[in-house]
Amino acid sequence: MKVAVTGTPGVGKTAACALVRSLPVRNVNDLAVEFGAVKGYDRRRRTKEVDVRRLARAVARLEGDMIIEGHFSHSLGVDLAIVLRCSPRVLAKRLEAKGWSAGKVRENVEAEAVDVILVEAVEGVPEVCEIDTTRRTPLGMARAIDAICRGEREKYPVGNVDWSREVLSWF
C-alpha cells in the first residue's frame, strides 16, 4: 500500500513523518530528484517544478508499502491519502515564522481555507482521511498517521475538519 501524507505547506507533514513508525517514509521532493522528475525551478515561488506524471510513473514502479510525504503526494497514484489540516490563522503564523513572503503565506492560507488539497485528494485517491493538526504535537500527528496505516480510519473521516466559521469571521 502506498500512502500519501499530504497537506498545505506548514501543516506539519515533515515533522510528523519524522516520527512515524508504521511504514517507511519517502519525501516527494527527494523522489522527484531521484527519478529525474524535476523540470525546473520557479523563482517567484522559490520551489522546484516537478513533472508529476513522470514521478507518478516512477512511484508506481516502487515495490513495498510506504508513506510518501509532501504537498502533492496525493497526485502520485497512491492507495490512501492522509490530509493534514491546520487552522488558517495558525498556519499563517507558522509560515510567517519560517520567513515566508506575505504573498506566499496568503496563497497557502487561502488554499487551506478552501480545502484545495483535500478536494484534490478526494477526487483522485480511492481512500482519504483527514487529521486536524492545529493543536497536535508532531508525535500526536505521527501516532494518528500510524493508527490510520494500521486500519483505524473511522476517527479521521473526510469532513471532520471545517474552517468555514473561521473564514467567515474574516469578513
Report the location of each language-model feature.
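Hydrophobic anchor at the beta1->P-loop junction of P-loop NTPases
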Residues: 5
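ATP-binding Walker
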Residues: 11
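NTP-dependent small-molecule kinase module
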Residues: 123-171
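Walker A/P-loop
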Residues: 14
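ATP-dependent small-molecule kinase phosphotransfer cores
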Residues: 26-76, 162-170
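P-loop (Walker A) phosphate-binding loop of NTP-binding proteins
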Residues: 8
